[in-house]
Amino acid sequence: MSRRRCIGVFALALGIGLVIGLGGVMSDARSQIIDMGKYPNIAGGWGRSEVYQWARGQKPPLTPEYQAVLEASIADRATGGHGTDTMYRCFPPGMPRQMLMYSPMEIVITPGTTYMLIDHIHDDRRIYTDGRAWPQEDIEPTYSGYSIGKWVDEDGDGKYDVLEVETRFIKGPRTLDGLLPTHQDNQSIVKERIYLDKAKPDVLHDEITLIDHAYTRPWTVIENYPRYKTPGLPGGPKRSVPRPKFGSTWARKTIFSVRMAI
């Protein structure tokens, strides 16, 4: 066989292989198409109108040991210190504090994974919804943790209403806000129920339950996020994104809100 014919046969075989391969990829892509009609309309940007703290009155059930740490942190902040706040040392907020973000968040639903893209220091969360089990071996903790979730149709209408999430393997050091005690690696489990308000579909709720040795019982808080019409994102009514006031004024407000909570 001549050299030219050999090259021609090789090129033909390569072309057939590419067509078969691309056909498999396209078939796999078609099988991964998601029916967005079954999911809640959570497009657009979501933000918070409160300062970068848990809502006033949501008191954490601290053990006596950690209550003493909180009081010492409040006293230190009152005299100009940083208290227990790890973000003053440039650590990421971590879970669940990153859900207190004051910058917009976008939620993206894909087959098998739901993403939360948070503009504040470019945090992101990957919530696996592909039915996987928890890893049998320990995995390296990260500040966002390892999240497994499932979409639930609570009212039986054939459409999903709630995203239930559990997050483990959360890295430390981190605090839940600017004053609460510091948590280290793998000390917390976070459970969430994320859903749209039925009466106000431009409001997203996140029921966050924290299980941690610093608390006498699981602690549940509820955070609310209005929908923002963020540039480049489809969404609801146009709103301006609030920005907290940092510095001494912000610190005083923080201390005041925590004192009201305790």
Predicted feature descriptions by range:
Residues 13:
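Active-site bordering "gate/hinge" segments
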Residues 2-9, 17, 21-262:
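Hydrophobic small-molecule pocket/channel-lining residues, especially in calycin-type beta-barrels
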